[in-house]
Structures are given as structure tokens and as C-alpha cells.
């Protein structure tokens, strides 16, 4: 049901996307988001210290466009050859345990459009030479699917993720490495630390003590990241956007006892099985949090200098978002416009 509520991915995200390019202009130009903003930003009497998003509420989307562009370009250009290819610690959908995960038999044409097989599919030069002589592997038109699996989350219920095809996981880890390293070496590290949640915990504790900061909790956050949202977030980093699109699986195999296996098309950008899900959603939520806080402070123009002044009051770790308490209303509005759901009960 969550996936059904998301917008259908644009042609840019199709499996046969070769030759297609992104044509998005920004959140403020998307009919879906503009109409959602009008619907959700009802005129209300503001609470003390709040700036209600009323007459100029759509300017909030314009501000978001400027913030996401600053964040995306601050990462610098993405080139796959500059970053490490690897397999993640989890299972993959197409390799039984013990089978060679470096023998890529399902490298699709779509994946090849951003990750050329001859340059990206081999962990060593000897592997490339061996494949050159045997011609055992190469690209295929058909893209492999992911597979829905349950992993432990709580004692009550498991978390559902999708194990990715080995070829896709190999390339997703490359993109993840780029995003982690570029975050750690840029100003974004003042708001995001992918390897340590301590800053979020400290600010959440401070907020619980003096009420100055609030932690916002989302429901099924990764399942609500739409391709439309990702495309608008990374539009100013086209090579990165191409890599995210090419390494994304479009279909998922669902196996359930007593029922016939079925393969479904997914609308969401990815599941938690995709190595890029966490850094991608973190950047989306960071951009929204920064925008909402700037808005609440009365800013209507965006600059990197203004953004950096928010360090110490905004931090994001995945879907764990901490913002000034008086920015929660604008944050909630933006999140809901972008198809996310805030847990108001927590």
C-alpha cells in the first residue's frame, strides 16, 4: 500500500532508459508537490514564535530546490573509477551461499550505461584477462530483480528488505563509498556523520532537557522515498543521478509460503537492501530539515553561509531528524508534501 501511494517513476527510471535523460526542473515545478502544498498548508492561527506557511507557502519548495542544489553540488563530481567497488556484508538475491559473488552473469545494459562492464565488473586485472579469453560473461538486455527477505528488527516483528542482485550491490557500494567519503570531507559533515550517531543522541538529549530541539520520527521512511523525490534532489549532480538510476532494481520477487511466487514492479526508489538507500534518504531529510529551519528563522533567500550557521541545531542520521522545536511544523509540512509520513504519536 505504501508503494502504491507513490508517483509512477518517470521514463528516466525505466529499465530501457538508455538515451533518456532527466528533465526535472525542481520540486517547485512538480504539479504533485505544488498541489500537495496547497492542500496541506491550511491557514491556521500560528503558535507563538512560528511563521505559518500560508500566503507564500509554495516559496518553501523554491527554498528546498536551492538547498538540495547546494547539497548535491557540494559532493563534487562522481566518477565510478575514483571509488571502491565491493560487496556488502549481506546476502545477494542471485548467489547461493558459497558461490563466487565476483562472477557477474547478469550485468544488464541499463547497469552498463553508468558502469561499463569492461571497466567496473572485475576486482582484478587477471579477472578481466580471463573473461576476455573465455567470453564467459558480458552484458544482457534484461535487468535482474531483487528478492524480498525478512531480517531481525525487534522481538515482535522482522524488517522486510530486498536482497539485491550481486551486480547491482557491487555498483551500489561504489556509489555509497563516494557519498560517505565526500560527506566526511565537506561542510555536510557538520550535519551528518554516517558512521557515528552520537551527535544525534547528544542533541536529542539536549532537546529533552530544555525543549529547544525536537526529534522527528517517520513511518516507513525508506519505503516512501520516491524516484521523483530522488531525481529532484540530485538533479544538479547528473553523473551521480545516472549512477543511482542505473544501479536501482525495478522489480522484486516475493515468495510466501502457500502462495505462488510473484514479481512486482516497485515505485519506490529502493528498499533498505540497496546500499545507497541510507545515504540518499539522509540527504533528502537533511535538505528538508535545513529548509524548514531557515524558513522558521525568517530567511527567504538561501546561501551556504546561512546553512552552515545552523550547525549544532540540525542533524540527521538516516530518518532520525533533529531540528529546532519551532521548525517542526514547517518540517512536517515539507515531509508530507514529499510523500513521507510523520509519526505524531512519538
Regions found by a protein language model. Give the residues of each.
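Non-catalytic, polymerase-adjacent accessory regions of viral genome-replication enzymes
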Residues: 1-149
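Core nucleotidyl-transferase/polymerase catalytic module
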Residues: 115, 130-346
